Amino acid sequence: MQSFAFSTRALFLGLFAVCAGLLGFGLYLQHAVGLEPCPMCIMQRYAFVAIALTALVAGLHGPGRRGTRAYAAVILLLALAGGGVALRQTWMQLYPPEFAECGPDLEFMLGSFPLADALPMIFQGAGDCSKVDWAFLGLSIANWSLVCLTLVAVFAIMMIARKRGG
């Protein structure tokens, strides 16, 4: 019996398409539904953009085995970083701070403070980071982001462990 396997190029381009779809849905929720993203949502969005661009470059490049592992390792690190932000936001939604205040938006923080000072402020989150404005099947946007980034991390691990390149 002949086994069916997707090429590395097709898998990376498929990941790009999935991430582009997720980003498109996020933009739909922002512009059509009117949900404004909090700083943590924007950080997760950046992770998806970076994963999508890495997957696109990998798909167009069509690397061999070592290149596939290198691209997959970068994607894994990006998924873990984005997943960490999504996990923190999920925690804030489950256990909101007692006195939540809306903090400054991401642009203001990055434009007004050095990066070393802005990053801790972003990860502290704003009051609106703990608010659940939208849910599907009982999961918030942060929960869905965590699920998707976990699946991306599993994908990357499978690509690293894959026996064949190309």
From Swiss-Prot:
Annotated GO biological process: protein folding
GO cellular component: plasma membrane
UniProt keyword Transmembrane helix, yes or no: yes
Disulfide cysteine pairs (residue numbers): 38-41, 102-129
SUPFAM superfamilies in the cross-refs: DsbB-like
Membrane-protein topology: Multi-pass membrane protein
Topology Cytoplasmic: residue spans: 1-11, 64-70, 163-166
GO molecular function, one term: electron transfer activity
Family per record: Belongs to the DsbB family.
Function, as annotated: Required for disulfide bond formation in some periplasmic proteins. Acts by oxidizing the DsbA protein.
Name by which UniProt lists this protein: Disulfide bond formation protein B
Organism, scientific name: Aromatoleum aromaticum (strain DSM 19018 / LMG 30748 / EbN1) (Azoarcus sp. (strain EbN1))
Gene name of the record: dsbB
